Amino acid sequence: MKICEQLHMTKGITAVIGSGGKTTLLRILAEELSGTVILTTSTHILPFAGIPLLVTDDIEQVRRALALHRVICMGTPAAEGKLTAPALPFSVLADAADYVIVEADGSKRLPFKVPAAWEPVILKEARAVVAVAGLAALRIHAKPCASWAHPGLESQSNKPYTDRNCSVHAPVHT
């Protein structure tokens, strides 16, 4: 069974949050879904290799690109080759594409996310939210917490993020 079927994906905006596989999940969903798909972000994301990147505030350009490619990536260029949210409102993109899949959380490539109070950046228009956690987090109980959990706790407690104030513990399996 396809992942998009297991998630009961519906047309419209879907936010993907968490850590350890969000970007990979976006790519898989784009491949599996029938219909037009826009991959984008409400935070930061790297462009997808092999998927056309569109930077525009012209909805007609978006429609033409979707007619040619079926799957596109959209965003606004930012530092370090990353993209931020697209210039067009997400609701406008949802009118142009069957699916708009939004990476709505950052985790700095760590396998587990402890969100701060203002995270994740889930759009009010999102019809569904998919939470992701990397399975690698289950095997790292012996490593310092700060080395595998994105530090949302730091900003909530105003204390340095250390293992002593880490409230997330991976199960110990041998």
Model-derived regions, located:
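Walker A (P-loop) phosphate-binding motif
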Residues: M1-G35
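Loop/turn-to-beta-strand initiation segments
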Residues: L68-I72, D95-V100, A128
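N-terminal phosphate/diphosphate-binding loop that engages ATP/GTP or pyrophosphate donors
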Residues: A30-E80
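Short coil/turn segments at beta-strand junctions that form active-site/ligand-binding loops
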Residues: G12, G35-T36, A96-D98, R127
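Gly/Ser/Thr-rich loops at beta-strand to alpha-helix junctions
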Residues: S19-T24, H44-I45, G106-K108
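General beta-strand structural signal in soluble alpha/beta enzymes
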Residues: V16-I17, V37-T41, C73-T76, V100-A104, ...
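Solvent-exposed alpha-helices and their adjacent loops that cap or buttress functional pockets
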Residues: Q6-T10, R63-A67, V92-A94, P120-K124
